[in-house]
Amino acid sequence: VVVRVVPDVRGMRQELDYVVPSPDHALVEVGMLVDIELAGRRLRAWVVAVGVDPPDGVTIRPVVRLRSVGPAPEIAELTAWGAWRFAGSRSALLATASSPVLVRPSPRGDAPVTQAARRGVSPADVAALGLDGADLFQPGVSVIRIPPAADPAPLVLAAAHRGPTLVITPGQRQASRLAARLGRSGLGAVGLPSGWSAARTGGVSVVGTRVAAWAPCDPLSAVVVLDEHDEALAQEHTPTWHARTVAIERARQAGVPCLLVSPCPSLEALGAGRVLAPGRATERAGWPIVDVVDQRFADPLLPGLVSEPLLNVLRSGARVVCVLNRTGRARLLACDGCGNLARCEACGAAVGQDPSGQLVCGACRAVRPVVCDSCGRTRLRNVRRGVTRIREDLEALIGEPVSELTAAGSSGGDDTMTRVVVGTTAAIHRIDHADAVAFLDFDQELTAPRYRAGEQALALLARAGRLVAPRSAPSPGRVLVQTTVPDHPAVVAAVTGDPARFAEGEATRRADLGWPPARAVALVSHAAASTFVTGLDTSGVIEVLGPVDDRWMVRAPDHSTLCGALAAAPRPPGRLRIEVDPLHL
């Protein structure tokens, strides 16, 4: 039998034909991993078609051997769509969808049918979320907006009770806990990557991080993506696919429900399907109490970024996590008179000062003189303090040790031992519980030179809300936000526990500026970028903007137009990176 294969060669897009001799042809199927010889080298390749008609007059070489069971046929087909949608290599997606270890090929029977749960999900558990369980699993995409304090496990259990369910989470720890909880409920479930072989056999629910979007799950009955707004679901290396996008397409092709769960759904999710949320009282009760400290009127006698409300919390004896995210930040300037943050008049992002003394926007590159747009003064001061300096200030103020926690590590052996911890946003991802979370300089998030800055800021507040007790608890926790922009929509949404209010305004703003998801965007960079964008067909609705920092932006009204244009353009030799749906612009 003649098969068509995709060689595992970086940058190679050509598919080749090989013959599978007897008796192996009885075992071969789409997705299987085989060894081939190509140009004197032995390479691995994935079978993407079986029983093809080879071109006339061409000698077909045999495959060397059947190497391993690979992605299920429907997943192998999905990678063809993924290569088009994310303008990348199909072989890279096939590698992502493959087992981390070799699985010996053998005759495959029908997938076992999942038995009914020995301990079904309680309707009261789903009802406690303020949702109607009967409406959750309608065909298509459902965006489930639940507050930070709500446990999403009942949704997962309800889905798994219907049959094998694919569950995608941002973090491995959450995935492991969910897989164990499904098992304790009498539902068959495996975690990735260790459970890939069992998942390939079928009949069980599959739980994993973003790579689970390409994992086997047969027969698939539902797809659930938890915290769909989390950037950990996006693959940074090319092709830069997003697990949420893959999950939506996979569910569509399989004809099963897709649930996107989040306390603050992304605009991409909101545009993909209907929104289900609890009543306002229930949703608000699941958000924390958010105290906003207006830093425009900071006490000059206190050290920088230490306000009177923060000092009161620190001296209360409570467990406090202080967040100051300096990694990769732009320089911030504030008026020495009124204290207003220096921001771009065009897009609202923070501005820095170039060598000539002018103020330059880090997002849109607009240039303006050194003048406060609020009071007209020409004297600006730097607003910058690092985590280490803040730790020293806090230790002096409260008279006890303070731990420092960043993505690179902690200042001590155990970052959870001290009562007060200060760190970057890594702290709220590595610590499970606190009485209070304080964002010392939230302006960094609100005015960052990124088009998603507001959305990302709200996501941080939601994450902090999971560390502290909600406002409905007998002893509610608090989230303290120090900012010079207290009326920012993201802050107001967290204070009121109403993320829908933020989403409405954010959608309008991005549509006016031509940013995703209102427009489809790709970034093109590296040495071959100039040649590639020159070959794009821009006679229609395709826009090519740039270069800025040696990157070009390609923009179109929709993904069908954008991805079609990217696929049709010739690929020049040399390094080329195409990032579709970039998280940062």
Language-model features: locations:
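Conserved RecA-like helicase motor-core motifs
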Residues: 185-195, 345-346, 354, 399-408, ...
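Accessory, non-ATPase domains that flank or precede helicase/AAA+ motor cores in DNA-metabolism machines
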Residues: 1-288, 315, 436-439, 447, ...
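Amphipathic alpha-helical transducer elements in NTP-driven molecular machines
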Residues: 13, 25-28, 44, 72-76, ...
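Cys/His-rich short segments
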Residues: 306, 312-395
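Conserved segment of the helicase C-terminal RecA-like domain
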Residues: 246-268, 456-493
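Accessory helical-bundle/CTD segments and flexible terminal tails appended to RecA-like ATPase motors
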Residues: 9, 102, 106-113, 122-124, ...
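Flexible beta-alpha connector loops of hexameric P-loop NTPases
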Residues: 230-241, 296-299, 379-383, 445-455
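Conserved two-lobed SF2 helicase motor
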Residues: 196-217, 406, 413-430
